[in-house]
C-alpha cells in the first residue's frame, strides 16, 4: 500500500461524526488527510474537543467556491435534516465486500489509473491498459483473493490484494499488500475495512509476513499501518521522481512467528473467504 501527494485539485463538503454524536461541518480538498487531522487533534477546535470519529456525509463539489457555499448551507440546516442527509448518505455508501473476477478489471483499472495520473500513491506514470489489468487480476488471484468494496448501487469504492514479495521460492511466505480507494471514498474507513479483511485472508492462506511500500512522507498512511500493527523497517530518500523526488518507507507485519519449517501457503476456499468477508461487510 502506498500513499502520497495528490496532483489534481478537488473540493468536498463533509460532516464528521464525533464521539458524542455531534456533527461537525467543513470543506476540504483531501478528505482522507482532513479526517486524519480531525482524528489526531490537528483539525478544528470543535473536533479536538468532541473527538472526531468518521465521516457521516461527504459530497464532491465543483470547486472551492462551491464547497464553501455548500458548507454554509449545511451549517444552517437543523439537526434533524442533517441527520436525514447522513442516514441517506451512509445507506448508499456502506461498503459491501466481495471477491474480484476478471470481469471487475475495468472498474479496478479506473481507480488505479486515476492514481497514476493524479497521485504519488503509485510511482507508475503511464496508465495501464484494460488488457494488462485483466491479466493482472488473473495473476493476482493466484496469490490470494482480490477483495472489492462496493456501495449499495454497485460503484467500486476500493480494492485490496497481495502480491509476491519476491519471485524466488524461499520468499513464498512473504507478500506485499496493495490497497486503493476511489478518490471520493477516501477517508470513509473503506481502506481500513478492506485491509483488515485482507490480513485475515492472508493469515488463513498461511503467509508469515506482509510488507507495504509507502511514499514518504505520508502521515495518514503511516498511521493506518501503525494501527494495524505494522512496523516501519526502513526509509530511503530520493527513491523515485514523480512531480519531484519522493522517498519510500517499508512497513512490515508478522502474521506468525517461529523457527519451524512453514507449511505451504494455499488459497482460501470460497467458504473460508465468504466467512471472513461476512465479518466485515455483506457479500
Identify the function of each model-found stretch.
Residues 1-94:
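GIY-YIG nuclease catalytic motif and its immediate N-terminal context
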Residues 17, 127-184, 195-196, 255-256:
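Acetyl-CoA-dependent GNAT
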Residues 96-108:
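A short beta-loop-alpha structural element at the N-terminal edge
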Residues 109, 113-136:
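Conserved GNAT-fold acetyl-CoA-binding loop/helix
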Residues 161-164, 211-214, 231-247:
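Conserved catalytic-core motifs of GNAT/GCN5-like acyltransferases
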Residues 192, 216-234, 245:
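Conserved active-site alpha-helix within GNAT-family acetyltransferase domains
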Residues 202-214, 224:
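Conserved GNAT acetyl-CoA-binding A-motif
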Residues 238-283:
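C-terminal "cap" of GNAT-fold acetyltransferases
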Amino acid at each position: 500500500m502506498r500513499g502520497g501527494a495528490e496532483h489534481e485539485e478537488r473540493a468536498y463538503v463533509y460532516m464528521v461524526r464525533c464521539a458524542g454524536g455531534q456533527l461537525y461541518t467543513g470543506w476540504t480538498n483531501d478528505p482522507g488527510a482532513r479526517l486524519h487531522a480531525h482524528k489526531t487533534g490537528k483539525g478544528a477546535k470543535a473536533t479536538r474537543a468532541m473527538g472526531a470519529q468518521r465521516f457521516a456525509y461527504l459530497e464532491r463539489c465543483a470547486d472551492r467556491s462551491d464547497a464553501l457555499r455548500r458548507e454554509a448551507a449545511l451549517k444552517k440546516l437543523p439537526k434533524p435534516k442533517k441527520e436525514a442527509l447522513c442516514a441517506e448518505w451512509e445507506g448508499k455508501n456502506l461498503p459491501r465486500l466481495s471477491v474480484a473476477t476478471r470481469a471487475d478489471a475495468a472498474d479496478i483499472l479506473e481507480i488505479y489509473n486515476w492514481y497514476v495520473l493524479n497521485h504519488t500513491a503509485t510511482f507508475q506514470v503511464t496508465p495501464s491498459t484494460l488488457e494488462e489489468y485483466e491479466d493482472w487480476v488473473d495473476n493476482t488471484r493466484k496469490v490470494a483473493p482480490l477483495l472489492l468494496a462496493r456501495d449499495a448501487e454497485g460503484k467500486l469504492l476500493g480494492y485490496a490484494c497481495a502480491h509476491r514479495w519476491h519471485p524466488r521460492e524461499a520468499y513464498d511466505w512473504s507478500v506485499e499488500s496493495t490497497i486503493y480507494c476511489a478518490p471520493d471514498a477516501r477517508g470513509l474507513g473503506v481502506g481500513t475495512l478492506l485491509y483488515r479483511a485482507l490480513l485475515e485472508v492472508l493469515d488463513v492462506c498461511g503467509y508469515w509476513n506482509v510488507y507495504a511500500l509507502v511514499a514518504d512522507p505520508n502521515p495518514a498512511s503511516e498511521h493506518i499501518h501503525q494501527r494495524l500493527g505494522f512496523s516501519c523497517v526502513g526509509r530511503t530518500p530520493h527513491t523515485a521522481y514523480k512531480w519531484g523526488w519522493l522517498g519510500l518507507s517499508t512497513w512490515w507485519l508478522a502474521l506468525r512467528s517461529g523457527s519451524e519449517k512453514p507449511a505451504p501457503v494455499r488459497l482460501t476456499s470460497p467458504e473460508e473467504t465468504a466467512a471472513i468477508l461476512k465479518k466485515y461487510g455483506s457479500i
